[in-house]
Amino acid sequence: MEPRMESCLAQVLQKDVGKRLQVGQELIDYFSDKQKSADLEHDQTMLDKLVDGLATSWVNSSNYKVVLLGMDILSALVTRLQDRFKAQIGTVLPSLIDRLGDAKDSVREQDQTLLLKIMDQAANPQYVWDRMLGGFKHKNFRTREGICLCLIATLNASGAQTLTLSKIVPHICNLLGDPNSQVRDAAINSLVEIYRHVGERVRADLSKKGLPQSRLNVIFTKFDEVQKSGNMIQSANDKNFDDEDSVDGNRPSSASSTSSKAPPSSRRNVGMGTTRRLGSSTLGSKSSAAKEGAGAVDEEDFIKAFDDVPVVQIYSSRDLEESINKIREILSDDKHDWEQRVNALKKIRSLLLAGAAEYDNFFQHLRLLDGAFKLSAKDLRSQVVREACITLGHLSSVLGNKFDHGAEAIMPTIFNLIPNSAKIMATSGVVAVRLIIRHTHIPRLIPVITSNCTSKSVAVRRRCFEFLDLLLQEWQTHSLERHISVLAETIKKGIHDADSEARIEARKCYWGFHSHFSREAEHLYHTLESSYQKALQSHLKNSDSIVSLPQSDRSSSSSQESLNRPLSAKRSPTGSTTSRASTVSTKSVSTTGSLQRSRSDIDVNAAASAKSKVSSSSGTTPFSSAAALPPGSYASLGRIRTRRQSSGSATNVASTPDNRGRSRAKVVSQSQRSRSANPAGAGSRSSSPGKLLGSGYGGLTGGSSRGPPVTPSSEKRSKIPRSQGCSRETSPNRIGLARSSRIPRPSMSQGCSRDTSRESSRDTSPARGFPPLDRFGLGQPGRIPGSVNAMRVLSTSTDLEAAVADALKKPVRRRYEPYGMYSDDDANSDASSVCSERSYGSRNGGIPHYLRQTEDVAEVLNHCASSNWSERKEGLLGLQNLLKSQRTLSRVELKRLCEIFTRMFADPHSKRVFSMFLETLVDFIIIHKDDLQDWLFVLLTQLLKKMGADLLGSVQAKVQKALDVTRDSFPFDQQFNILMRFIVDQTQTPNLKVKVAILKYIESLARQMDPTDFVNSSETRLAVSRIITWTTEPKSSDVRKAAQIVLISLFELNTPEFTMLLGALPKTFQDGATKLLHNHLKNSSNTSVGSPSNTIGRTPSRHTSSRTSPLTSPTNCSHGGLSPSRLWGWSADGLAKHPPPFSQPNSIPTAPSHKALRRSYSPSMLDYDTENLNSEEIYSSLRGVTEAIEKFSFRSQEDLNEPIKRDGKKECDIVSRDGGAASPATEGRGGSEVEGGRTALDNKTSLLNTQPPRAFPGPRARDYNPYPYSDAINTYDKTALKEAVFDDDMEQLRDVPIDHSDLVADLLKELSNHNERVEERKGALLELLKITREDSLGVWEEHFKTILLLLLETLGDKDHSIRALALRVLREILRNQPARFKNYAELTIMKTLEAHKDSHKEVVRAAEEAASTLASSIHPEQCIKVLCPIIQTADYPINLAAIKMQTKVVERIAKESLLQLLVDIIPGLLQGYDNTESSVRKASVFCLVAIYSVIGEDLKPHLAQLTGSKMKLLNLYIKRAQTTNSNSSSSSDVSTHS
């Protein structure tokens, strides 16, 4: 007999390894045969269980043969199911990722094969890789390596077009610093493979990732080797890595062939020629270590030793604690054998690799190890010292800034190792300090380093300046700001140091310091003697790499990429064409190998004004030439070119003597050669085709530049060369830039690109402002902000700043979109701004130094989460900069930041941190509002709570601003629902200030909401009732006024809905609201007859068709409905007369039929003529308001929306008796005379007079019952009732005996005497109990709502017997007429559950019986929707009663419906399972058992957070229930959870 799916599942789930090996091949054959396994494709549940079993039990098995069989079975399923296997990918991927790190080669290889097969047959590669990114951070190094190998295989199998590589590359970059060398090699190989497929764009992108130069050099060398080998398979159509914002947008498009024509050798030369100083790179440390002699170690040795430790497992935090205590005991006692101490130090690294940092208590224990580390670092055994330094370096590299306390404590001890004569100890200390500086950026380390810069030991001083240089290169400016003066003083002392090598290092430090704090650096420069100034200049001049000028290239603006970026990235990644060689007369290039720097000290304004003032600048400015300028000025720190001549772009160099007779190498741009052919290009410094947009394509279109035009003819040019922003053209006639000037050289209409200088403005050149012309064929001049071009002639004052500010107003653009989303234009990239901070203001202190992009989002978040207030402030600064640079956060980052912000709402440092937090919050909301829907509840409620706190006025204003931004940023309906939830939340106890804030917020929200945003839900009704109680708040007049205004605002917002909402509330609430609304209408009619909304300033323009459509209210079918004159907005005299006011309870007007109108008029025509009301009309409409609200039959939102969905209008149920269209003129009924010519009432007023709709059985269920209950109930006119309905409904109307009606009227009168006449009311209730058992349809149709409301009010009676009797009557009505409760379910359930709190057992028993009947009478889905929020928020015993009631409901609900509601049900039950009351816990378990009996194993995924013991208990009850019910022979079990 062929095995079926059930037997297959049983075989898969069995634990016996031998049997698994036997049935494995059978399962493969079975799944491969479509005929045998036909049911495989139909039973999705069984398939899910099968795949889950294979993934968890087979693929994760410890027996590699079982693992291989499991993969084979999965492979067969993939082959069989094809793309239908896509739903299972999420189940199998975690196991397959784990297997990538398996010890067996065969397992790893088969795993790779299976993954590729899934990408090929089940889903596209990107879908799979999106779910595999976590593997890059896997704790098993083989898995991390395997992920890289899998990426290589994917690229070779599917090509680069199938992947969005921009998502993957950052993860690979992280692995470049992995402790394991195999992982690092695999990461490099994967980058090389990406390069092979994508091309030069990868090189440019990596340059901006902030990677150490040594690593970049290694990677770029491999790139060059691949390119030389001819193995490149780049396609011009690859869009996956195309021109993301991090790729240089100035190069030609990918269709250009220039990228592959640049000689590889020149690229390598450029890369090596721009190597950063050796002290900061691994290569540098290696070479320096080699010079140290035998025994010296370097960073490479340390990194290898990081994971050269025994493997340990951490099973719990207790286990971790015991391990660290044992380590501390060994390390704290130097009497232990040195080998034990070495092993203890290694074990710390083992624990780190095993994930110790993920445990909360790890950092507490780490602090206790400070003393032990100090002792180890002082040990006489070099091996112990070496291991201690390695461990400290490892801690810093893994923990980053979290190692701050340990680093600060141990650093002085490590410095004492530096002068040690034992090389192993000295170099270990040096490498440890380097690693700590590189990974732990804590300002408190700076004084430790600077204090050692004055050490008596020459070796220590040299090393300290080297460390200081590394620190200035690696750290961000905001981390240094605190110690500017200390750094400046230390560098000054270093420049004067007695040791020549220390002085050299100090001069390097000066340039690093200058890149961060240019103004302070210039000040320092001027305090130096001339000999030291010359030494600094010669240091700059004689450098044949950028060793002496590590930061001249780096923007000190706000991105990590630009801060840590090597100079090799500064050339265009595609190279330049050789066909554009300059023809300008030249002299030979200097052969010294030093960089040729051109004159760039030309102020834009100086050049513009030089037409009228042609004079030599040497006599007027102290620094008239680049050579004479101080290093702090723009010229001397000039445009460091990266030997572009060698790549063939090349501009020739002419030597021209300057004012001082020195010979300067003048680089003439290619664009200057073509002035006549390209006027717009004159003066451009750029020679790349991607930058010279105008040169090869006929120039820019007219109007692209608003600056002074350049004449085509060179003869017509002024003798004063015109500075085109970043022009490199030099002349003795030009005026040098004064030292104190803060004017940048903004790029104007020409391309001053990123690769020529970071000082220049980076955003406004046409090279960035236009898409590549070779792709689109023409430029887009409109992209250049006019204010930027105008900068050429602006003064250096606020005019320029204003222009810059204007240009900065760019649309927000997300930063990390997939490669290929952007064109070559990177004007909106994060690296672009009108001018970088380096060029605009920061050099001479224009804008604060902390306005720079933070180096790493993770670090910013760590700062924000710090317990130290100053670090939190620092983190907020960094976050502000990230947000201002439009760096959007990933989903994971957003989640963490939301958690941090939630905690920050309670930050105690209000002035220091909370104020800045509020500023950051506003930016955060504006940028990420689309991703913060889930956090909106916390955001809104916390801000409102803060409005009730005692804050400074300035802070309070910021809270208010955050609220305003929140209100404008999120959907109004969502905000309104949250506020309703917040008001009814029993766990919240807002103070008076918070209440006022909530109410004012609702009022302002109501002004902007659409009527459809106001939803009449149970929460809204509860909230409105609470607001009504706030109108009588005895302690605060502000709360009373605000609550009244809110009620009026909601009434104005959606009058039909609000009126129906009031109709569902108890009479006491109705009375309070009705009185308020009466006064409001009365006052508004006195002050302005135009609109009742004037009292709260509501704008008439808010009326929309959805809001004002009268067809959504019962009014349209009654006396208050719209007449044709209302529809057309005419006066009454122009069309017809209107129905009279509802003068008497028994007067029955005939409603006009709107069928003809309905065909002719759309809802948009329904604008009310609210300007033509007078006070007499309003007063006449108020006569029956109280009774109308009281008797208004509440109808659910579903009933209201149903006809709207059908044709956009509410069907009018009442038509004239003969079926013809009724005349607009109304007939008088009951002796009431019609007043002629009165206009229709305003919709709001007429709705207050709405009569309750009748609930006739059958299709006429919404006909009106025009007879409100009143003292005159017995005077109703039967014939009038019959005229108000269809003829065919007459048979459904039963003649209610007069005595019954009289009896009911008397009973209701009696019951309305609350807390009085106890015995009489008991008799009335008993009489009513008898009537409920009789079939008196007419009575119930007329009086049901009144009876129900009176019964619910009676539940609050003083006499307990009355309360119990009322519950019995209510239960009897429920049993006999359950359908009538459909629209009153919420109110009835809540009142019944509240009765469970009663102190008398008799009442509680009656309440339990009523709740049981409710559970079996009301529709199950409706019942559960009401019960779920109560279970989650109510206290004992209400939550117990609600859970019991829900259990009964679950027993009668369909499986499909229950599955849909599980998401709402389970949280409350899990919460109940944790309740302190045992009865609540027990009820929750029974409810879960009931749910399991309905849906079975589908309950399993929802119980993931239950502990093992709770799962066992639940399983026990499930088995017991199954045994009792004998429903199943086998005891199905929910999976046990440990």
Swiss-Prot record:
Residues 251-268, 548-567, 574-594, 606-628, 673-692, 1106-1115 have a biased composition (Low complexity). Disulfide bonds: none annotated. One of its GO terms (cellular component) is centrosomal corona. PROSITE patterns: HEAT_REPEAT. Gene3D superfamilies: Leucine-rich Repeat Variant. Residues 693-705 have a biased composition (Gly residues). Its main location: cytoplasm. One of its GO terms (molecular function) is microtubule binding. Residues 1299-1330 form a coiled coil. GO terms for biological process: astral microtubule organization; basement membrane organization; cell division; establishment of mitotic spindle localization; establishment of spindle orientation; establishment or maintenance of cell polarity; exit from mitosis; Golgi organization. Residues 1254-1538 are annotated as: Interaction with PHLDB2 and RSN. Belongs to the CLASP family. Interacts with CLIP2, ERC1, MAPRE1, MAPRE3, microtubules, PHLDB2 and RSN. The interaction with ERC1 may be mediated by PHLDB2. Interacts with GCC2; recruits CLASP1 to Golgi membranes. Interacts with MACF1. Interacts with mtcl2 and MTCL1. Microtubule plus-end tracking protein that promotes the stabilization of dynamic microtubules. Involved in the nucleation of noncentrosomal microtubules originating from the trans-Golgi network (TGN). Required for the polarization of the cytoplasmic microtubule arrays in migrating cells towards the leading edge of the cell. May act at the cell cortex to enhance the frequency of rescue of depolymerizing microtubules by attaching their plus-ends to cortical platforms composed of ERC1 and PHLDB2. This is CLIP-associating protein 1. It comes from Homo sapiens (Human).
